[in-house]
Amino acid sequence: QYLHRALKENKRILLEGQLGALRDLEHGIYPYTTSSSPLAGYGAVGAGIPPAAIKEVIAVTKAYSSSVGTGYFVTALAGEEAEELRKRGGDAGEYGAKTGRPRDVGWFDAIATRYGCRVQGATACAMTNIDVLGYLDEIKICVAYEIDGEQTRDFPATPRLSRAKPVYVTLPGWKTDVRGVTNYDE
């Protein structure tokens, strides 16, 4: 009743999901999925409101990639490079909140992010944790995959993903601590 009343009064309602589109049972990387849908469209179902009531979908992504558990991870880093990013990531590093298990980390994957935004129906995308990358001389962004000798910018939510190799552009890092910055002029 509360949400229906708020809708009737034209109040703003914020619904928040967890996980990401790639963990969705229908549109994610099966079998590395979850049993319930993390897609924005299911927010209406969970909240008990009409789907048409959702006017904006803001996809939220980190400036680098991370993953818990098994599954395909095209931009995964290894060794010291991964450990340094893992240590600096998030509020307490990229470690499981309850288990303390290290998460897999990697470069930003624009192909997976675009796919996730598409299946979410995102009207905007917010990027977080940019400050984490402030120690790097260079930052890589995956802009395509090479699969079986061919480049693609389409995300294959199929076993073909296991053969994907990242195609990167390399950008200069900013080598500055940007924590606490609240506007572009800073």
Summary of predicted features, one role per range:
Residues 1-186:
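Non-transmembrane, aqueous-exposed alpha-helical and coiled segments at domain scale
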